[in-house]
């Protein structure tokens, strides 16, 4: 594998090498320079949040170059030597397969199960070996750029987060509760919602009874609004389940329980807002003549932007047809809607120069994503936990009762709430241009943490564990030196074109799952995408006590953000993998009881990997790695009684090596490995006697921006 050349690095850092042809809406957004008064987050005056529906990261971006997709070099191990892509289903395995719009109805692909029970069955506490058994074979389908022209163009132009997770192993409403309140109940009222409930209008004496973030904004004098058309918000506004908003709706003149087909919801107005300020969270803020009146549905947002009245914080809830939800919507329809929102925001350049648009997805539906979620440790049957944490995680376990009055929530089962699988997240703004990837761990609470950073209104419902693990999105921006860019113009899909495509797709049969002999993993092209600096500095070392049959692993976090380490025992893959949450500035250690041999596979953020393999019959060399600038210092220490020979294999990033090291009993040897030419990426495999192996891979962070893993893909 060739090393990364200077030319490749410069090309990636400049623009991602991907701005070839972009829709006018994106081109216009890129052409408007950022407002720069302080060169900090204080320059942001408006944050707009559009949460779409039910797509996994791999389904949309598994083949997108330069992100952690199908070319991921370090994935979880499965039983029988299978790769994570070879998911068991009855008597065969199913690989991710292309939902090819030329072969069938890809745009309106069938939805899959996506509730608490089947989500946990698929995740299986991190084992993830039988995904389609829980989620159906359709869950393994993915899209290419031909099915996702706008979403891929948006990623090429702005910033895509490739480690953004939904907040729960669950469906729509529980995840959206995190977006609007920072919790599904445990930290707000010592209760829990894990199934959809109270997601529409209802009586004010029923519903969730903890405080929401819009209420805190209102109290702090921060202007906010939820833009939605009633009656069609597709049940995607979780604020509808809270009594204060229900009461505001009834007092505004709406029925508490509207009959089916009711479409006479009272339009929002400034006069109503003066009396009922929470009505803008659950009211008809985008009144339209009927369900096909898309211009009417967006007119209120357009007027606010044109008049310079866009609130400081806005949430947009799309109607069903444009929500991107499987069955009821499609990628092209959702892309068209997002494009319309972006067009509206850029109609007023002064407003757009101060605006951040966050486009994310509430959950993955049931669609497959290969990365293990950075969840809290899972409970074992004996009451112990598979892993540890330096921060309490009782808020992350389903041990809380249902909210009072609930009729749908199941009995607590002790399982982990989340975070769940990865979903796409676009950071669209004048400060995030350039086709960047950001690989920090985020979830829906990260959106609220970003609002906290900008507007100073804290959300106490966000648990200490979530704050330790999930970042605040600020690493996705460069406020001091925003990148200018102006790509060329191409024609965009109109609403008529989108709807015609959708109709033609619906006339076709579903895309079939390929026969076993015709399967093949989709190609992710190798590309070093410009990648934001991350707050991680992690160290892992292992030591063997042969006499006691114990392998000890120590995890140290010297970075500024907590991290979750996943450890798979490849000799016992039927066991729950252990997960360790290590806060910034802290460390953890744990033991593995081994028989004659051990084989541990450890994964962390942004491709961080350690592998430890060997036998237990004698003392073995120990390896530690310490970062120094863009270099890695590797120290080998031998505590055995006879000499040990270790070979350090050729580094695939730099082509340097191999190296031979002969260790005498009691001797320590250190070597320095420079990673500047590879953007900080390293991959070192150490091979010794009797099957002894250590592997160390990852990216060294220095506070400077870099590139994504240049060896991902083919």
Region locations from a protein language model:
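N-terminal pro-sequences and low-complexity stem/linker regions of secreted or lumenal proteins
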Residues: 2-714
């Amino acid at each position: 594998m060739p090393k990364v050349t200077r030319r490749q690095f410069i090309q990636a850092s400049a623009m991602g090498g991907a701005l070839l042809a972009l829709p006018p809406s994106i081109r216009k957004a890129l052409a408007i320079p950022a407002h720069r008064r302080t060169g900090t987050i204080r320059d942001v005056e408006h944050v707009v949040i559009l949460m779409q529906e039910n797509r996994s990261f791999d389904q949309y971006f598994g083949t997108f170059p330069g992100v952690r997709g199908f070319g991921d070099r370090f994935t979880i191990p499965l039983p029988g030597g299978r790769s994570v892509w070879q998911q068991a289903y009855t008597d065969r395995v199913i690989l991710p397969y292309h939902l090819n719009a030329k072969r069938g109805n890809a745009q309106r692909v069938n939805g899959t199960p996506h509730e608490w029970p089947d989500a946990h069955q698929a995740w299986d506490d991190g084992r993830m070996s039988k995904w389609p058994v829980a989620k159906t074979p359709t869950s393994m389908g993915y899209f290419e750029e031909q099915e996702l022209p706008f979403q891929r163009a948006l990623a090429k132009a702005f910033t895509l987060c490739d480690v953004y997770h939904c907040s729960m192993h669950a469906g729509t409403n529980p995840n959206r509760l995190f977006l609007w309140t920072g919790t599904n109940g445990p930290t707000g009222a010592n209760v829990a919602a894990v199934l959809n409930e109270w997601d529409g209008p209802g009586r004010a004496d029923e519903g969730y009874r903890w405080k929401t973030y819009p209420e805190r904004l209102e109290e702090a004098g921060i202007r906010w609004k939820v833009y939605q058309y009633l009656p069609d918000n597709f049940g995607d506004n979780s604020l509808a389940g809270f009594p204060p908003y229900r009461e505001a709706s009834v007092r505004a003149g709406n029925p508490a329980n509207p009959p089916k087909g009711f479409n006479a919801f009272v339009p929002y107005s400034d006069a109503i807002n003066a009396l009922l300020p929470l009505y803008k969270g659950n009211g008809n803020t985008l009144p339209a003549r009927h369900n096909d009146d898309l211009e009417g549905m967006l007119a209120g947002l357009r007027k606010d932007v044109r008049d310079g009245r866009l609130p400081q914080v806005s949430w947009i809830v799309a109607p069903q047809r444009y929500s991107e939800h499987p069955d009821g919507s499609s990628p092209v329809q959702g892309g068209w809607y997002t494009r319309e929102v972006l067009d509206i925001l850029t109609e007023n350049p002064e407003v757009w120069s101060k605006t951040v648009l966050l486009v994310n997805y509430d959950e993955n539906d049931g669609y497959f994503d290969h990365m293990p979620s950075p969840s809290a440790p899972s409970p074992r049957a004996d009451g112990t936990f598979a892993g540890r944490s330096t921060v309490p995680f009782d808020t992350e376990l389903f041990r809380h009762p249902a909210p009072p009055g609930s009729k749908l929530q199941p009995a607590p089962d002790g399982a982990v709430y989340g975070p769940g699988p990865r979903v796409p997240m676009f950071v669209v703004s004048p400060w995030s241009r350039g086709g960047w990837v950001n690989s920090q761990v985020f979830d829906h609470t990260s959106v609220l943490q970003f609002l906290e950073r900008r507007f100073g209104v804290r959300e106490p419902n966000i648990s200490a564990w979530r704050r330790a693990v999930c970042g605040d999105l600020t690493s996705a921006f460069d406020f001091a030196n925003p990148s200018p860019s102006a790509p060329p113009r191409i024609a965009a899909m109109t609403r008529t074109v989108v709807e015609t495509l959708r109709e033609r797709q619906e006339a076709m049969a579903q895309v079939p799952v390929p026969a076993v002999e015709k399967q093949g993993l989709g190609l992710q092209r190798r590309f070093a995408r410009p990648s934001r600096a991350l707050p991680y500095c992690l160290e892992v070392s292992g030591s063997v006590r042969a006499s006691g049959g114990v392998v000890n692993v120590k995890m140290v976090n010297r970075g500024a953000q907590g991290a979750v380490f996943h450890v798979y025992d490849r000799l016992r893959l039927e066991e729950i993998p252990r997960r360790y949450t290590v806060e910034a500035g802290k460390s953890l250690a744990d033991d593995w009881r081994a028989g004659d041999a051990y084989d541990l596979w450890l994964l962390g953020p942004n491709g961080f990997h350690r592998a430890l393999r060997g036998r237990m019959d004698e003392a073995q060399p120990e390896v530690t790695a310490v970062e120094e600038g863009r270099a890695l210092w590797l120290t080998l220490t031998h505590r055995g009684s006879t000499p040990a020979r270790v070979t350090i294999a050729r580094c695939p990033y730099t082509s340097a090596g191999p190296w031979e090291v002969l260790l005498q009993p009691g001797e320590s040897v250190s070597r320095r490995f420079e990673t500047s030419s590879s953007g900080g990426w390293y991959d070192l495999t150490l091979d010794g006697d009797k099957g002894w192996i250590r592997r160390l891979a990852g990216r060294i962070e220095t506070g400077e921006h870099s590139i994504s893993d240049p060896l991902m893909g083919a």
